[in-house]
């Protein structure tokens, strides 16, 4: 019985691979169904014999309560975008300045959702969304219902891989036809359909929707020496990789590939929105490293966005939290990239002057980065006798004089008590990526500000339930709920607070780097500018912005008030002692470990102060090698790098 079940699982998985991955089915649907029903009957009679890679795991559904947060062991970085050949050439120049011998690999940019798959001993244990790159959502049960995601691998390896989950065009058309017949709203585009499907709490729906994947990265330390070898390894392990890639000796080669793919784009069975260009050599990737947000060794070329004509009906001017005054055009509605667009950014006053944009003009509208509607240019042939657009001289919020500095393209309100700026700062402070105060959105901020209850972020922590009950729409329950959310936010780790302060140029990733290094905001407030600038991924711009902010009397007063309100100013993550055994060292983990899981070994190395890298380079200080270490160990030996084993790591 056990042998027959094993045979059926093996045969059915092979047939599924032929159908879903190779598009070369060797048996009829009827023959597959007969074998599948036999397997179901055997598993029903003998549930103790069900194998982890049985295809029956992919069908049927169960209702999930929700999705738990999942902290990625290996962060997922976003990519720097490029929209022209000139920007690609600038990327190439930056790479070749340090590595003139570098070559590239060009891969299609699939228009789907980034996912991470983690296997232990060859079994799928976690499937997660990208989230913010550090924390995503655990959607393992849903990803198990995606037909081409391997439930087990042919080798009992520990590995984390990255890729894209998408909805093929054929599946999209089928699903939308079904929704239309059922009287349900159709999905706007395949990407939205894939996103909605992966967020389903009913796993049975996921199984029916026909999602697919392309995997392209080994996130855990790799034995490969190039990105092309990574793709070959993923292929060998049973993952679906996209074979529409090319190796390029120069940026000219990459541009040739981009042009050829652009011509074939509509004929592909899936949506793409560009081409990703990566340095192929993993050692060079390691040397180039990362900025705060993105790798220096890759760039995502985005295809030109869809464009439509629309008329500018009027222009609104709004003030953001940094005082920048932004013009937004109100448009005659147009359908653009699957959505109705009636507003589009005009960027700034210099852009309006450069393009000579006027109210009443017919303009070309597109979605910048396929996300933000923007005005590209005026259609001159429709120009009538419109007047030059009036530019405001006073802030639309506080009526203060606006400034237009020579080195800036935007108008700016410099009034420190401008209501719009203050409210925007409060909204940002309460936002999910900052202090995450649930329920404190723009409408509530406006009410609090209008009632004179808050003027800066410290005032939020002075609010009482009675204060909230004075606001329109608040009852005892809602007031207590918001009050508790405010109190809960006091215990956030300090990087949330630092990001929430809205210091110019200091984003969420930079905030974490800073508080990890300095431990708390009071220490950071007195840090030397050069000490800040020297941190990996930061630099002088962020350092100057921070030191200028904390040097102000207002910032010192704000910190004092937050401390008095018992808001946590300390980093609550793992802090590494500067005297730790591996402090400041770059360590590569390679080979098969006998007693520790790879993520446990990585966590221990980091706790000891090490920066764990994915491949050996000149910057590597130490290699911890298990069995079957392969080429990584060989390269380390050639470079004279110190080698240690698992027993040594355990002894620390």
Swiss-Prot record:
Required cofactor(s): Mg(2+); Mn(2+)
UniProt: NAD(+) binding residues: 29-33, 78-79, 107, 130, 164, 278, 302
Catalytic residues, chain numbering: 109 (n6-amp-lysine intermediate)
EC number(s) stated in the UniProt entry for this protein: 6.5.1.2
GO terms, biological process: DNA repair; DNA replication
GO cellular component annotations of the record: cytosol
Keywords per UniProt: DNA damage, DNA repair, DNA replication, Ligase, Magnesium, Manganese, Metal-binding, NAD, Zinc
Protein residues bound to Zn(2+): 395, 398, 413, 418
Molecular-function annotations in GO: DNA binding; DNA ligase (NAD+) activity; metal ion binding
EC class of the enzyme, as a word: ligase
Reaction(s) catalysed (UniProt annotation): NAD(+) + (deoxyribonucleotide)n-3'-hydroxyl + 5'-phospho-(deoxyribonucleotide)m = (deoxyribonucleotide)n+m + AMP + beta-nicotinamide D-nucleotide
Classification via PANTHER family: CHROMOSOME TRANSMISSION FIDELITY FACTOR 18, DNA LIGASE
Role this protein plays: DNA ligase that catalyzes the formation of phosphodiester linkages between 5'-phosphoryl and 3'-hydroxyl groups in double-stranded DNA using NAD as a coenzyme and as the energy source for the reaction. It is essential for DNA replication and repair of damaged DNA.
Family the UniProt entry places it in: Belongs to the NAD-dependent DNA ligase family. LigA subfamily.
Protein name (database record): DNA ligase
UniProt organism field: Streptococcus suis (strain 05ZYH33)
């Amino acid at each position: 019985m056990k042998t027959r079940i094993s045979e059926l699982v093996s045969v059915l998985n092979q047939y599924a691979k032929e159908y879903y991955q190779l598009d070369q089915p060797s048996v009829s649907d009827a023959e597959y169904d007969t074998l599948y029903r036999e397997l179901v009957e055997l598993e029903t009679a003998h549930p103790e014999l069900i194998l982890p890679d049985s295809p029956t795991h992919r069908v049927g559904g169960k209702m999930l309560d929700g999705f738990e947060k999942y902290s990625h062991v290996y962060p997922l970085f976003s990519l720097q975008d490029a929209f022209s050949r000139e920007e690609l050439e600038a990327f190439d120049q930056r790479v070749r300045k340090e590595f003139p011998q570098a070559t590239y690999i060009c891969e299609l940019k699939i228009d789907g959702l980034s996912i991470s798959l983690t296997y232990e001993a060859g079994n799928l244990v976690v499937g997660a969304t990208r989230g913010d790159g550090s924390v995503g959502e655990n959607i393992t049960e849903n990803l198990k219902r995606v037909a081409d995601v391997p439930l087990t691998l042919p080798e009992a390896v520990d590995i984390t891989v990255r890729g894209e989950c998408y909805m093929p065009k054929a599946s999209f058309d089928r699903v939308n036809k079904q929704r239309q017949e059922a009287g349900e709203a159709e999905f706007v585009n395949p990407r939205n359909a894939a996103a909605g499907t992966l967020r389903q709490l009913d796993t049975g729906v996921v199984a029916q929707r026909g999602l697919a994947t392309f995997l392209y990265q080994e996130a855990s330390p790799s034995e490969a020496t190039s990105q092309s070898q990574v793709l070959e390894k993923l292929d060998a392990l049973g993952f679906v990789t996209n074979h529409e890639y090319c190796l390029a000796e120069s940026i000219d080669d990459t541009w040739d590939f981009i042009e050829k793919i652009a011509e074939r784009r509509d004929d592909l069975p899936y949506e793409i929105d560009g081409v990703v260009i990566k340095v192929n050599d993993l050692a060079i990737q390691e040397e180039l490293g990362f900025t705060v947000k993105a790798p220096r060794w890759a760039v995502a070329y985005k295809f030109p966005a869809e464009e439509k004509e629309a008329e500018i009906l009027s222009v609104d001017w709004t003030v953001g939290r940094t005082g920048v005054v932004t013009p937004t055009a109100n448009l005659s509605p147009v359908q653009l990239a699957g959505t109705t667009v009636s507003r589009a950014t005009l960027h700034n006053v210099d852009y309006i002057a450069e393009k000579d944009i006027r109210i009443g003009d017919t303009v070309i509208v597109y979605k910048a980065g396929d996300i933000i509607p923007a005005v590209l240019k005026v259609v001159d042939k429709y120009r009538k006798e419109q007047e030059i657009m009036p530019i405001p001289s006073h802030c639309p919020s506080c009526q203060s004089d606006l400034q237009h500095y020579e080195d800036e393209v935007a108008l700016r309100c410099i009034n420190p008590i401008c209501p719009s700026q203050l409210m925007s700062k409060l909204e940002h402070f309460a936002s999910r990526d900052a202090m995450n105060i649930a329920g404190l959105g723009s409408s509530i901020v406006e009410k609090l500000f209008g009632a004179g209850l808050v003027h800066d972020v410290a005032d939020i922590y002075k609010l009482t339930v009675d204060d909230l009950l004075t606001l329109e729409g608040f009852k005892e329950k809602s007031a207590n709920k918001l009050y508790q959310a405010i109190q809960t936010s006091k215990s956030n780790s300090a990087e949330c607070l630092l990001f929430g302060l809205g210091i110019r140029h200091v984003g969420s990733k930079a905030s974490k780097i800073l508080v990890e290094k300095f431990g708390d905001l009071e220490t950071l407030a007195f840090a030397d500018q050069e000490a800040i600038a020297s941190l990996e991924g930061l630099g002088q711009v962020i350092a100057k912005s921070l030191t200028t902010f904390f040097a102000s009397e207002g910032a010192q007063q704000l910190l004092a008030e937050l401390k008095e309100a018992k808001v946590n100013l300390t980093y609550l993550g793992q802090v590494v002692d500067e005297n730790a055994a591996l402090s400041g060292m770059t360590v590569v983990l390679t080979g098969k470990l006998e007693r520790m899981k790879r993520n446990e070994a990585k966590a221990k190395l980091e706790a000891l102060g090490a920066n764990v890298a994915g491949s050996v380079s000149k910057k590597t200080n130490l290699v911890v090698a298990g069995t079957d270490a392969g080429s990584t160990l060989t390269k380390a030996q050639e470079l004279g790098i110190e080698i240690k084993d698992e027993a040594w790591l355990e002894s620390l």
